[in-house]
Amino acid sequence: MFNEICIYEAKLNKLDEIEELMKEVAEFYLKQDGVIDVHYIKRTHRQKDFNAVKEGELPIRLTRNIGKVTYVLYWAMENEEVHARVGKLGIEKFYKRWNRCLTTMTKIILGENIV
């Protein structure tokens, strides 16, 4: 299995637009042959610190956003060929609308499963 993880920083005035776009992109990707799973995650919590994790404390809900909201894409597919083919289609279809919503370039991590 091949995976892409993207970290996005969205403009505060574009949150509704980007979340609607995420639904469109996920639906589009899931219809493509070789795509296994697509998840978009909105950062809503943080840990107080490492000791809080060791003590089993609950994460802290974020109550305000300063300048941006962070989202993560987890996208799983059969192999690199699927990634190349579907990624190209996605960029052709969604790039301009997507880019208008972001504060900075997307951070992208690509790789294969270990477990």
Over which residues does each language-model region extend?
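Short beta-strand segments enriched in hydrophobic/aromatic residues
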Residues: 10, 22, 42-44, 77, ...
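Active-site-flanking beta-strand signature of metal-NTP-handling nucleotidyl enzymes
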Residues: 2-9, 72-74
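Short, flexible helix/strand-to-coil boundary loops that buttress conserved ligand/catalytic motifs
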Residues: 22, 86-87, 95-98
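Short amphipathic alpha-helices within nucleic acid-binding modules
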Residues: 16-19, 71, 78-89
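Glycine-rich beta-strand-turn "strand-cap" elements at beta-sheet edges
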Residues: 36-66, 92-115
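Hydrophobic alpha-helical core bundles mediating ligand binding, dimerization, or RNAP-core interactions
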Residues: 22-25, 29
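Glycine-centered tight turns that cap/initiate beta-strands
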Residues: 31-34
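Short, flexible turn/loop "capping" segments at secondary-structure junctions
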Residues: 1-2, 64-68
